[in-house]
From Swiss-Prot:
Catalytic activities: (6R)-NADHX = (6S)-NADHX; (6R)-NADPHX = (6S)-NADPHX
Cofactor binding comment, as recorded: Binds 1 potassium ion per subunit.
Family annotation (SUPFAM superfamilies): YjeF N-terminal domain-like (SSF64153)
Gene it is expressed from: nnrE
The family this protein is said to belong to: Belongs to the NnrE/AIBP family.
Name under which the protein is recorded: NAD(P)H-hydrate epimerase
Domain YjeF N-terminal: residue ranges: 1-217
Requisite cofactors: K(+)
GO molecular function: metal ion binding; NAD(P)HX epimerase activity; nucleotide binding
Amino-acid positions noted as binding K(+) in the UniProt annotation, renumbered to this chain: N49, D127, T168
Enzyme class: isomerase
Transmembrane segment boundaries: none
This protein's record includes keyword Kinase: no
Matching PROSITE patterns: YJEF_N (PS51385)
Length: 217
């Protein structure tokens, strides 16, 4: 996928920033197909998947959604997240550009550990923590989400879940679980073409949509 993106950029068909914007637009466009939630909770990791998440957050906020972003690795852009952790967003990337745009347009960010503060209700959770590059165990990253989710479920919340490209906790290339409890998505919005993991997700009843973001020649 990265080779395809690099080829599209080298050919002048799109910039990385344009591709990220299109990806976020595709995810945001999928949301109206579901019952309208009261609240969108967007989870952003430190890479390009997280950059997509910041685009989604901005676009949903522009449609008058109440949007709360919870993130990991973005302390340089959002000092309120606390001391930097071991994994941080790389300066100069398109993801950082979109995180700053979210901040500059009035958006805020809270640490993942604050997720349990969200009151139970009608909630859309957008998973943009890890994307196609994930290959390592990620239980620690997902633990705050599952702690919050279990509380919402006990309180009778109506929770809908959407993952950007690949649910956090799965290897994109072989579908192997990288966490004891990978993120459970109702819908996955992927880009350009399905990845090997999507066959496993479909077999488990997950809806997978593939969006055209202009990578074809």
């Amino acid at each position: 996928m990265r080779a395809i993106e690099n080829a599209a950029m080298a050919a002048g068909r799109a910039t990385g920033l344009q591709l990220m914007e299109r990806a976020g637009e595709a995810v945001a466009a999928a949301v109206p197909d579901w019952p309208a939630p009261r609240l969108a909770v967007v989870l952003c990791g430190p890479g390009n998947n997280g950059g997509d998440g910041f685009v989604v957050a901005r676009l949903l906020a522009g449609r008058d959604w109440q949007v709360h972003v919870f993130a990991s690795g973005w302390e340089a852009v959002f000092p309120e997240l606390g001391p930097p952790g071991p994994v941080r967003a790389r300066e100069g990337t398109d993801a950082v550009t979109n995180a700053r745009r979210w901040r500059d347009e009035g958006g805020s960010c809270r640490p993942l550990t604050a997720l349990a503060e969200v009151e139970a209700g009608r909630i859309l959770v957008v998973d943009a923590l890890l994307g196609i590059g994930q290959t390592r165990p990620c239980d620690d990253l997902l633990e705050p989400y599952w702690r919050a989710r279990d509380g919402w479920d006990r309180a009778g919340a109506e929770v809908r879940t959407l993952s950007v490209d690949v649910p956090t906790g799965f290897d994109c290339d072989n579908g192997v679980a990288l966490a004891r409890r990978p993120f459970e998505a109702d819908l996955v919005v992927s880009f350009h073409a399905e990845k090997p993991v999507h066959a496993r997700l479909r077999a488990a009843g997950v809806t997978v949509a593939v969006a055209d973001i202009g990578l074809s020649s």
